[in-house]
């Protein structure tokens, strides 16, 4: 049924719907919490700037996929795309960071689910934590739910009416404060940037969408433009959500919040938001923890002997148990996990890497895109390397002045080192060497 619903859309409409439904981020529920330290309007400006860069990056990755004949013939995944265009050695660091990002998403989902459902229902958090662990264990033992892309996208899109209803109730309630904070620090700004970066985790899903849509629209125009439009749609949804929640909440209402924005929002606005928020939490974070826990299990299984694959399910469960220990020690927050992960992993994976892939694909790809399927400007080396350099500069700033503590600075330094190593190894492999016949 879901596949038939998407089949009725134009190729462009299919890409946009799949993109928004699959990519709709869990970090959306942490953005208002992070933004409270700087104020909604400065956070909105950061969101607009990051969203613009991510739009270019998503389109760049889409064009790289369009140019990859091996992907069209045999399929593949994001790591194989990186290996194909940048070289096997250059793919090692991005592969490791992708695993870290996925593990961080499992951790954040566990924290968000257990803390938020406890706040919305009054049932103790430890009870929710135990229930989540059991549910995740059962799913992993069954190999996950094996949700097709169309069904997964429909489930993601089903969260939009819940978001809209909660936003409308928040605006109607009022009493919030959207003015900028007067005394925010550089570290608070850094957390907002990190959480905002984690709104854009499309790398894996663009590959999945390409596999679904390129056979029907092989010129690639729908994939490239739909990826850009989908990213803009995610940015617009995040901006509207931030303003709506800020209409009902003051920054002090979110100070020290461990879970998502939904708990404080329900406290301020009443039972209707509690009911809708519980449904949204289960749908958005529940779907997120299923996807990411299965992904972690498969990543670990790939690195174990075949006889020990069954032990791979322990890895995501261990991440959830780590979340429980950190919560008990009052040492972690939902927004904090995404803030660190966004800086340490996504500035490379979602910003720098797609631009590098585009440069390499224009040099070494074996399929020429159809009319309108080329990313304007960003494929020029000067523009692409400027964006890559901006990502490196941001990581350097996080490693020195924008990070909140030693752990965050080390995480940013690791991300910077991974970016430098990836660029160096890709250059050594000749991925960016000029070829006269390529534009």
Report each predicted region and the residues it spans.
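Helix-loop-helix junctions that connect adjacent transmembrane segments
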Residues: 3-6, 123-132, 146, 150-266
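Transmembrane alpha-helical segments of multi-pass small-molecule transport proteins
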Residues: 11-22, 94-99, 119-144, 158-166, ...
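Hydrophobic transmembrane alpha-helices that form the core helical bundles
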Residues: 56-127, 274-304, 351
């Amino acid at each position: 049924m879901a596949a038939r619903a998407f089949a009725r859309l134009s190729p462009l409409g299919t890409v946009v719907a799949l993109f928004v439904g699959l990519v709709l981020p869990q970090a959306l529920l942490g953005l208002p919490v992070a933004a409270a330290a700087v104020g909604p309007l400065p956070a909105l400006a950061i969101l607009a700037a990051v969203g613009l860069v991510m739009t270019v990056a998503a389109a760049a990755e889409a064009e790289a996929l369009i140019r990859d004949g091996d992907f069209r013939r045999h399929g593949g995944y994001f790591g194989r795309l990186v290996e194909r265009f940048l070289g096997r050695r250059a793919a090692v660091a991005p592969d490791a960071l992708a695993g870290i990002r996925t593990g961080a998403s499992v951790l954040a989902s566990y924290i968000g689910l257990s803390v938020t459902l406890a706040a919305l229902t009054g049932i103790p958090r430890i009870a929710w934590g135990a229930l989540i662990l059991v549910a995740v264990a059962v799913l992993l033992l069954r190999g996950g739910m094996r949700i097709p892309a169309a069904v997964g996208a429909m489930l993601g899109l089903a969260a939009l009416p819940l978001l809209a209803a909660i936003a409308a109730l928040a605006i109607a309630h009022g009493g919030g404060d959207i003015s900028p904070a007067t005394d925010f620090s550089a570290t608070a700004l850094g957390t907002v940037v990190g959480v905002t970066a984690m709104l854009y985790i499309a790398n894996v899903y663009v590959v999945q969408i390409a596999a679904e849509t390129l056979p029907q629209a092989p010129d690639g125009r729908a994939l490239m433009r739909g990826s850009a439009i989908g990213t803009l749609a995610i940015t617009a949804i995040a901006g509207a959500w931030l303003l709506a929640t800020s209409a009902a909440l003051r920054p002090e209402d979110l100070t020290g919040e461990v879970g998502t924005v939904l708990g404080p929002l329900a406290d301020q606005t009443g039972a209707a938001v509690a009911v809708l928020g519980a449904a949204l939490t289960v749908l958005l974070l529940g779907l997120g923890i299923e996807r990411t826990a299965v992904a972690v299990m498969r990543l670990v299984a790939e690195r174990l002997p075949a006889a020990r694959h069954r032990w791979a399910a322990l890895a995501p469960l261990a991440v959830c148990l780590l979340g429980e220990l950190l919560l008990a020690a009052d040492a972690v927050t939902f927004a904090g996990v995404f803030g660190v992960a966004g800086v340490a992993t996504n500035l490379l994976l979602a910003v720098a890497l797609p631009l590098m892939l585009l440069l390499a694909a224009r040099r070494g790809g074996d399929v020429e895109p159809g009319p309108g399927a080329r990313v304007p400007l960003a494929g020029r080396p000067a523009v692409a390397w400027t964006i890559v350099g901006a990502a490196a500069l941001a990581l350097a700033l996080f490693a020195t002045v924008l990070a909140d503590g030693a752990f965050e600075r080390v995480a940013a330094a690791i991300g910077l080192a991974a970016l430098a190593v990836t660029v160096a190894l890709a250059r050594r492999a000749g991925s960016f060497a000029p070829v006269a016949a390529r534009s």
